[in-house]
Every structure is written in structure tokens, then in C-alpha cells.
């Protein structure tokens, strides 16, 4: 009788091995689910960035206002008689910059 019990126990362990540690076992499935969650989080951040860039591209294609704003902010270009006021966040500097040309 003991031989039957021990052989059944060995067979039970042999059957459980692929379920837990095999190629498609629970541990691999759990790890893959975690990787999918991380990738979905990255994808959502990239989707937000893409939406912002898409809006920038649309603004640059449709009107000159976005081009003027970029020229002013990034390169300091302003028109004759125009004022450019840039308010910086408090953590960087509390001063305001005013330039007149």
C-alpha cells in the first residue's frame, strides 16, 4: 500500500511541475501579465506625448500663430514694437523678463 501512495505522490508532483514551472506555467503567466501592465503604462504615456506632438504639428501646419510663438519663446525673436513677457515658474526664478525691440 505504501508503494502505491508514494508512487501517486511522485506522479502528482510530476504533474504539478509543468503547471508551476513549465513553459506555460503559472509563474510565467504572472510575469507576462506584469510585463503587459508595464508596457500598457508606457504606451499610455507615449500616446499622450503623441497627442501633444500631433497638436503641435497641426498648429504649425494651419496657422502662423504657433510659428510666431515658437520663434518668440525658443529664439527670442519679436516683431518691431512688440513686447514679449515671459513669466517663469517660482521654483526657477521669481523675476519676469520683458524685452522690447
From Swiss-Prot:
Keywords: Cell cycle, Cell division, Cell inner membrane, Cell membrane, Coiled coil, Membrane, Transmembrane, Transmembrane helix. It is found in: Cell inner membrane. One of its GO terms (cellular component) is cell septum. Its main location: membrane. PANTHER family: CELL DIVISION PROTEIN FTSB. Essential cell division protein. May link together the upstream cell division proteins, which are predominantly cytoplasmic, with the downstream cell division proteins, which are predominantly periplasmic. NCBIfam families: PRK00888.1. Belongs to the FtsB family. Part of a complex composed of FtsB, FtsL and FtsQ. This is Cell division protein FtsB. It comes from Polynucleobacter necessarius subsp. necessarius (strain STIR1). The gene is ftsB.
Amino acid at each position: 500500500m505504501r508503494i502505491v501512495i508514494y508512487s501517486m505522490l511522485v506522479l502528482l508532483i510530476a504533474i504539478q511541475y509543468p503547471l508551476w514551472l513549465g513553459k506555460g506555467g503559472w509563474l510565467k503567466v504572472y510575469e507576462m501579465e506584469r510585463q503587459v501592465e508595464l508596457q500598457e503604462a508606457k504606451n499610455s504615456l507615449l500616446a499622450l506625448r503623441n497627442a501633444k506632438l500631433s497638436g503641435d504639428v497641426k498648429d504649425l501646419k494651419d496657422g502662423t500663430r504657433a510659428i510666431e510663438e515658437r520663434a518668440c519663446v525658443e529664439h527670442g525673436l519679436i516683431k518691431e514694437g512688440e513686447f514679449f513677457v515671459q513669466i517663469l515658474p517660482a521654483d526657477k526664478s521669481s523675476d519676469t523678463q520683458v524685452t522690447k525691440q
